[in-house]
């Protein structure tokens, strides 16, 4: 019996075209709440970047920064920054190979350099451009996640130098960088433990590589129609895209609305 549902944001709940949750999905979320199902966001975004979504619907909890910072009912349930050696590796790689990197702390968000690739990222997510700071600023600070602007052809510039980092990709132009112990599945566990819900009673929706650990961990994992084919082969169900209200399609299929 499904008692909790975790939703990725970009490309799942929110369309990359409209940057909004559709009326049909909002209606479905309200119907789920009326059934007593706990509803959570699970995203690579910082909590400060979720205001447009939170203004539309008040979720029961938040897995943010790809599982590194999780909150519910005003409490911090998981707070796992990168180890200092991982931050050093990241800073050194960004300086040596001069790639753009967004550093996400608990309170601060900053970027070392701005170019057309980073501007497109900001447009795609419809968020403000972070404050610009040199990469060295991150040294000795609590960094929970970074977004490194490296295509697949250039990702070796980071991966070859950073054994203490874990990376996931949900876009051709950038990688999410988190601690080795990180992931959305870890964040899911933090919220499920808090609400005393077994993981087999959880459902999860996502479309990117950074969602896969969560989809495989949940009792039911649903991939959006925009997900990669390899990801689709590993999950329990494949639904439509965000622009096709794929979340609603899957909820109807599983008899939840």
Model-derived features: where do they sit?
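Asp-based, Mg2+/Mn2+-dependent phosphohydrolase catalytic module
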Residues: 217, 222-257
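Conserved acidic, metal-coordinating active-site core of Asp-based
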Residues: 93, 97-217, 226
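Short, acidic loop-to-helix structural element flanking the phosphoryl-transfer center
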Residues: 18-37, 80-86, 128-129, 182-193, ...
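Asp-based phosphoryl-transfer active-site loop
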Residues: 3-17
